[in-house]
Amino acid sequence: MVADVVTSRINFYPYTVLPSARPVYQYDLSIHISNQGYSLDNADSCRALERFCEQQDAALGNNLEHGLFYSLIIDFPSSDACPISSFYSQIDLGSRPITHTVEFLSTQKPRRRGGRVGGMRNNIAGPPITPVQATVKVTRVRQMDPTDLMSMKILLNILLRRTFESSLGMLNIRSGFYDLRNPSIHAIQIDGRGYDICWIPGFRLTTATLRGKLGLQILPETTKVRSKSMNELLTERRGNIHPSALAVITVMAMHNGKVFRVHSIVQGQTIVSPLANGNETDYFTYYSTRYRDKIDSAGLSLLRHNDYCNSVMQQDKFILKLTPLKRTQNGKVVRPCNVPSSLCIIISDNEIAPYGVSKLSTNRAAVALSTMSPDALLEKATAFAARLAEDTELQSLLGDYGFGFTSNPLELETFVCKPPKLMMDNTSRIVTIEDDSGGVFHNLLQSPGVSPIYYSNNNQPATGMPVWAIMVPRNLGNDYARRLRKELTERVRSLAGTTAPNIGDPPLIAVELSNQRREMYRVEPYKDAFKALLNKLRLEYKDARESEIVAKIQLVVIVIPGPKQDRGDLYKGIKQFYTHMGIVTQCLLAPKSSQNELQWYDQAVLRSVCQQIYAKAGGAVWAPVLPPQNVYSKSTMLCALDISRPKKTVGRPAEVPISTAGFISTYDGSFEYIYSQKKTLVPNRLNHGGELQQQTLMEAFIKNSCNVYLAFNNRILPDHIVIFRDGVSDSQISATLEVEIKSLYECLRQIYHKSNRPMCDLKVIVAQKTCAMRFSAVGGTVLRSGYYVINRSPDNRQQGSEFLMASQAIVHGTTPKPIRYKIIFDSMEASVDNDSFNQLIELTNAMAYGYVNWPQAISLPHVLHMAHHLSKFCGEVLRNGDDLFESCAIFGLQYRPFFI
């Protein structure tokens, strides 16, 4: 494999463990409040913990100035309303739980209803005045080795967060830190007019492991906001200088990493103040008088720096009254607050969107609010690392816990893996070939019949899709049904190429839906429509039994009513019914009605639907091809296993959810034709989550996959088997090797021994999506898909070799989040310097281009991505019904991606 070497910077600064390092202990914190109607929050739980430490120090005779509380590393929750539940310390409190009864003063005041205490309410800015009695229980959870990378990572994340908020004076927004005092201004053009864009420079700090070392990665990150100030907007000639004149502008503001919409803007405008009868005052005086405490509290909690907060409020003489948005994506409602106007983000056209979105509409033109970093800021990130190395408070804090920090980044060679040689276009059926000399792409016409559709005809392979149907609700009308059938048929035939004559004309089946909304989403009318389809096919196949007629149906396109959020149970019911019958379905939402007319589908939607129909019927929409010199281009079977574990049942937290295992294997040289298997892992008292079943499960999966491969490859087993595994952390690798891989290897040895074949080259690769590493380009280097780093680990405890790859599309500045691929088992024990290892990387990158629904690269190999879809579809939609475990028919449901 020939890979381009790219000049890049990782900005990875290793940490080392000093000889003075001591073990760190993790503790659980449990606080029981005696006061009636009291709700424990973050601040009060910290006060209770402080009182607990004072009593513990008094009992042990410790120095109160540098006692237990001083040594704690508190894991503060992300929400102020949540209490502290755990902390860390190098002081050992013993293995037995310690309990103290404490008293502290809270800022919450008791609410009185009818002379009784009915709960507590917040006194945001006032001093703590309400006495609260609590029982605090501290339990040691575990002892962490100072050399353990995960324990160091936990401590570093907490220590860095505490240092930044206390001494460096930077604003923490999500995982980035921004300095609002040093913005740089740039200009962009929108609709021929220039708009000032304010780039707020910041840095993303992540702790990651690389080459067996824990380190701090510092990458520059920016936030683009409109730099035009609120004062300039208010003083523009808009007819009436009143906040209501800004109706065409939606103002968003940041507060504690959340986004608010501005309810009103107050600056220098006179109103009749309710503070004094009949007297006029200005908005700023009115709001600052009425909401002074709330404004101060919001500013202090936002910046956590008194001097900076006061200077901001003195310079900008107007206040933003913020109201929460409707609901965020995770269902939480943000609370209203007041913030200084200098922290506002201005977005035109009343666009309401969360912070950090990729595109927003401004005067019907796209403006990117990018969180990626321009190349010029990489030098600032390096300088920022030197600043951290010189920070005395940080160095002292790290030294107390036995950490050493270097200001010199770790240098690594980085490469770019080339995209697959052949890539089939999804509409024009053009094959794209890359020129090795200059990287130029040439388009060559290709016969569209390279990926014919296969179907079963009396258990014999045939070509085409003669029997399929379209079910349409009757209320959509005949014109809609005929147009839909015409467009779907033409598009599928264009995809089929030379096999197009074998694509039959689908019959239209009317579905009798009720006009009542409650009765519209019932599955029974679609079952009746299936009976009508069978009756129509009986006229053509008079002598065939019903089971034979059902076996002839290749696919059914079903139109279901919208909107999308209301069709959940109907969609699941349809999928369960037809999958049980062994029929592949493609669901399509009914179009929206506008002025008594149906809006037709977007062409991109129809193209995607037809691609799914073509793939579900047994065709390959496109096929990435490896170079002939790659050893995995011939006689290779790819496998992927993913286990879906749904959330626990609401109301019954003690119940263990049923897990679903999905297994995908390939049996064709193009790696596009798959064989799917599914099994339910039933938990019980001796087998809590079904883990003990995975040993026999993997053996059954690989036996069936080998039998399928034999059937399609002249009874010859593959020379190479590569298994991708998802959902395995570093702590689970040893158990996975012992439970799954060991028995799997012995099973394969028996299979190959019976076939008189030498044992295959078996590789098991774990894909970890939680990698925090990022790669950045320098000097105007253009990053492409397939950017990777070979991670050679000198640590003998780290099993196998690994590489980090960002295979999906590259955006400007930095790569997307890479995937960490760790080879946990290799029967050939290939070195990372071996060509076989590089060819394995090339295989991993090429398979990222094989997913049916996306014509470009995705983040994972398509077999692993489809294994995830299979397990999730069977667990959530099919509700763990009949297992797709063994099949007698070669061309059955398991040979088609019915779950995408």
Swiss-Prot record:
Protein name (Swiss-Prot/TrEMBL): Protein argonaute
Positions of the PAZ domain: 229-313
Family matches, as InterPro entries: PAZ_dom (IPR003100), Piwi (IPR003165), RNaseH-like_sf (IPR012337), RNaseH_sf (IPR036397)
Chief site of localization: cytoplasm
Family assignment from sequence similarity: Belongs to the argonaute family. Ago subfamily.
One GO cellular component, as annotated: cytoplasm
Cited function: Plays an essential role in growth and, with Dicer, also involved in microRNA (miRNA)-mediated translational repression. The RNA interference pathway is implicated in antigenic variation having a role in regulation of variant-specific surface protein (VSP)-coding gene expression. Several VSP genes are transcribed but only transcripts encoding the VSP to be expressed accumulate. Antisense RNAs corresponding to the silenced VSP genes are detected.
Location of this chain's protein in the cell: Cytoplasm
Positions of the Piwi domain: 555-879
Ranges in a coiled coil: none
Keywords on record: Cytoplasm, Developmental protein, Differentiation, RNA-binding, RNA-mediated gene silencing, Translation regulation
Superkingdom of source: Eukaryota
BP-aspect Gene Ontology terms: cell differentiation; regulation of translation; regulatory ncRNA-mediated gene silencing
Assembly with partners or alone: Interacts with miR2. Highly specific binding to the mRNA m7G-cap. May be a component of the RNA-induced silencing complex (RISC), a sequence-specific, multicomponent nuclease that destroys or silences messenger RNAs homologous to the silencing trigger.
Entries under SUPFAM superfamilies matching the protein: Ribonuclease H-like (SSF53098)
GO MF, any single term: RNA binding
Comment on protein domains: PAZ domain is absent, but Ago is capable of binding small RNAs in the same way as the other Argonaute proteins.
Organism: Giardia intestinalis (strain ATCC 50803 / WB clone C6)
